[in-house]
Amino acid sequence: MSDDEYGDIDEDVWDVAEALTQASQTLPSNSPHRRKRRRISSDQELDDYNDDGLSIQQRRRSRGSASSDHDEGDEKRQSKYRIHLGAEEVPAAVIMGATQADGMPDSSPYRIRGPIYKRPRPLPSPELEPKSTQALASVFRPTKAQKQNIVPQPAPAAAYDFSKELEDLPSDAFSPSPPQQGMSTGLITINSSPPFESTQSIISQRLVAPQNGLRQTTLFGGRAPNQAPSSTQAKKVHNYLVDKVPEPPTHHSLDREAIKTWVYPNNLGPERRYQYTIVHKGLFNNLLVALPTGLGKTFIAATIMLNFFRWTKNSQIVFMAPTKPLVSQQVKACFEIAGIPRSSTTMLTGDQTPALRAEEWDEKRVFFMTPQTVENDLKTGIADPKRIALLVVDEAHRATGKYAYTKVVEFLRRFNKSFRVLALTATPGSTVEAVQEVIDNLEIAEVEIRTEESIDIKEYVHRRDITEILIDPSDEIIMVRDLFSKALQPLVNLLCSQKAYYNKDPMSLTQFGMLTARKTWMASGAGKSANMGVKGMMNALFTVLTSMGHAIKILNFHGIGPFFSNIKDFRAEVEGNKKGGKYKNQVVNDPDFKKMMDRIQSWINKEEFIGHPKLTHLCDTVLNHFLDAGAGLTGDNMPPSSTRVIVFTEYRDSAEDIARVLNKHGPMIKASVFVGQSDSKRSEGMNQEKQLETIRKFKAGGINVIVATSIGEEGLDIGEVDLIVCYDSSSSPIRMLQRMGRTGRKRAGKIVLLLMRGKEEDSYKKSKDNYEQMQRMISSGSRFTFRHDLSARIIPRDVKPEVEKRFIEIPPENTQDPSLPEPKRRAKARKKPAKKFHMPDGVETGFRNASKLNGNVAGPPSRIFGIKRKPNELNDDELAPIPLLDSVLLSGRDMAELDRRFLRVPDGALEEVEMPDLTAQTITQRSLTMTAKVSHGKYTRKCVDLFSKLSRSQASEDRDIKPYGDEAPSDLGKMPTMPLEAELARIPKAPKPTQVSKLPQVTKTTSAPKKTPASRKAIPKKAPTRRNRPLQHENSDSEDSTASMAMVSNLRSSQIPQPTPDSEEEGPGERVDRTSDMEDLEASDDSDLGSLVDFIDPTQIQTQMTLTGTSSFSSSPPQMERWDGDERQKRRGRGGLLGRAVERDKAKNLSSQRSIPTMTQESSDDDLPTIEDLVRGDTTTKKTVDFPSSSVLSSGKKATPNMFTRKRDGDVRGRGAKRRIVDSDDSDE
């Protein structure tokens, strides 16, 4: 036997392990009492078991081979699911299979396979150590979970305790030995799961679900510390690929070639990975970038602006910064880094007029502006919100409340759904709520935040040494505090007596504390139930002590000088009786207050007096810094110092006091204040021009120390600043980080904090801890809700731009002119443009009727509200496109269609086109019908209006005789006929008239006038109205024909005999002229339209005339026919138009035989059709019928139907005997 077959285990240990290979064995009992050790079988049975054809060594050799005896059918039938078996059905061999190998040959499931080991070498067996024995026993001891879930099967013999058999085994009894022939080298995993047969390698596979019931041990065999048990259910995490929300296409015009790539400039040297990542994410998401100062936020903004400038054709890009110095700083970055052309760039502030800004919005594409200017231009309509594609917001932590940043984004969202937002800041906010408000107001979808400890920016962050100097108050400050405290003590005691304030130390007063106490007292029961006198007293106390709290803060943190200036203003107000009061006078007149003011006045008069110990440490720090930098060397050829210092303070009075003290150490120190634009009571503000001039001198070396207020905390990029001195501390982490970020941009910097021991020291620690906590929260993103729904991609989803890293060529125009791209004022100032109202897409404009407010009306807004769009004006200079020749020539098929439909007519059809019948569709003529392409003209509308008004103006009995009537008379068969032959024989010829009488003029009145017979007195001529006369006569030369017609009518009416009252025969009556008709309609609104006579020019109608082919006027009246009963029945039977046509034919034949013209006068156009031919379409000869005159109607006689029949057949043709033509400009179809 070779050495490889031996292990490190003693032979006696192997003999003990052989006892475990019994054929039938059950699990240990769950009984709490220990059972006795007892043999289950004799030695002979054990020997038989060893000799049954499968020895122990053979089984040991066969562990390395896989179970090759399984047929393929068993493998196919094996399911991936297992059936759970109860504890009583699980054999001991399966439960204890953790010590067995999977590759054993088939055997009884109740047989326990031998342990994995190697035979020990023949050496003296060492003594077993108790620790190893206990460790090995712990491996085989069943766990608590197994004891609870396993119930032993009943057996004839008592259960055997296996753990006692293995107590003497060492800890490395089952460690693997060098591989033997036929034995696997794979590792065996001990677990609580039952072994499964597999044809694969015996190397254990890791399961996804966590395993239960395991006990972890250390490398030396000891038990690992207990941990919380894992859940029985495996925690599965599914990474589903959710489809993105469909996004409507952008309305911006994109360059399809440019959007295939995005440019990353290499002008500034090697690439920074964090900048590349932020730029790539900012191109497709609304991004909030939070980077420490000096890490290239300006470069990131310029790169994104460059790509949007390339991608869009005419869209606009807006960069907003709170101050003009920050705006000008970004302008230079875009010119020198991104290479955006200067001709497309402008910088607009409130200094430019609205008219000048309107020109820039029409011509430029890139704008650098303050947020207030952008807001005003959007509200007035100067800027088009739909054209803005990118909005860059610098110092984004200001976007809270009602600041202009918030209003601009809100205004853009109303009109524009597709624009990108890039927000830049160093400190997003000091609280979770503030950061969430910034995210909501700017519609942020992603956040890229880095701290100074981030791995990818550590190599670019310069070292900053922060030094904290704790200062105690001076003796002068302590003396002033004591005197001031005594002066305020009575007021504080009075306030505490009302239980409104509980701290009786006046030096602990603060503005915030007083405001909070006042609000609390007013809301309490004592404040609500107090009378007006008490409320007035409390309000006065709170007001005085609040102002005193501000003065105490200045005294403690800024010095005696600023404190004296504040108190002096307070005293001046009281002594000048401007805002005097009981309690203010009490403070001013207090002896301790007067003593304090006198002492301060004597100190300030001394030049060497320094009002606060901070000033002493400040001067020492600044002087040492310049001496270390070599600035103290003097000489003619010495260059100016390259180091710079910035001192930050909160108040303007303190800044002026600091600059005064520092300038005493000149010329080494040249200090200047840097404040805002507003003026205070004691100092003048700095406009933007002065601010830019101060920064320019600071960079050039003319000024080496700037004493700045909060205006200098944000955004100033002055790379040579090596020392920052914080004269006062702030509890806001935003302000502290902004101050510290002014140094360490291009080289290592130093920060010195001057802190008063106590409250100011605590404020700084608070801000520092708050900053670190907020950075961790923002980085995790678990506490914030981002607006992914409002972040549009703008670029189509099918387009994936690829990066193009290249050197950007700067246009020559960007370097030739170093000035800012501010628009210059024109010689002639333009007027302020009118306000424009931009409408969102799909908005409803106009007014909606109340009947359509239910929202059920579908269609475009123009159809809902009846909006008439103005047609686009055609450009006269623009040439019409010339079509192709084949598109305008007729093809063979078109020629066949032309010949079939238009050149040939079917057999039997008339080849002549008749005149249109104006009485065919009278109802349709009174209203406008629908049109498809060509709308109705103005003359068509006038004619339709005329026809409808004429129809409304007629009485019900007159509609039948008018040319525009629709209904036939219902009593046509009852009308008698006059014997025309007899009447013509009796009536003599009428003498020639010597004087023509004119018709009376119709006068418009508001009430119906009295009807009078026609007068023969001449009246003035009525001037024709061309506007209301679309129908004109061909030869209208005069207006005398109207009088001639009236004369003829009167002569005929005088010659016709009138029937007696008893006679059944009706006389012809008088002619119904238009005067009586118009008199009936004068009271109506439409009476001013006149009648058809007004539209007919009667100048060509003579007193007596004879028309060829028609009836003529005669001096003798026609004979009237008498109708008998049979004839009346026949006429009634024929009825309507048919009977009228038959009667007309008879009258025509009789008139042609009897009528003798008395006067012949032919005009040059007698061959033309008459008005009746145009109206009725009948050019045949018609019977002359007299009409009843106006005298008959005016005399009170009843008009008979026969009168109107004659009127329709005769007088219409007499009055309109000439042809009328239609004016050429009245035709619109």
From Swiss-Prot:
Entry-linked Pfam families: Helicase_C, ResIII
GO molecular function ontology, one term from the record: four-way junction helicase activity
Cell compartments where the protein resides: Nucleus
GO cellular component: nucleus
Domain Helicase ATP-binding: 278-446
Helicase C-terminal domain span: 614-790
Region (Disordered): 20-85, 811-855, 952-1229
Cross-referenced InterPro entries: FANCM/Mph1-like_ID, FANCM_DEXDc, Helicase/UvrB_N, Helicase_ATP-bd, Helicase_C-like, P-loop_NTPase
Sequence motif: DEAH box, positions: 394-397
Keywords, alphabetical: ATP-binding, DNA damage, DNA repair, DNA-binding, Helicase, Hydrolase, Nucleotide-binding, Nucleus
Family: Belongs to the DEAD box helicase family. DEAH subfamily. FANCM sub-subfamily.
Function: ATP-dependent DNA helicase involved in DNA damage repair by homologous recombination and in genome maintenance. Capable of unwinding D-loops. Plays a role in limiting crossover recombinants during mitotic DNA double-strand break (DSB) repair. Component of a FANCM-MHF complex which promotes gene conversion at blocked replication forks, probably by reversal of the stalled fork.
Protein's name in the database: ATP-dependent DNA helicase MPH1
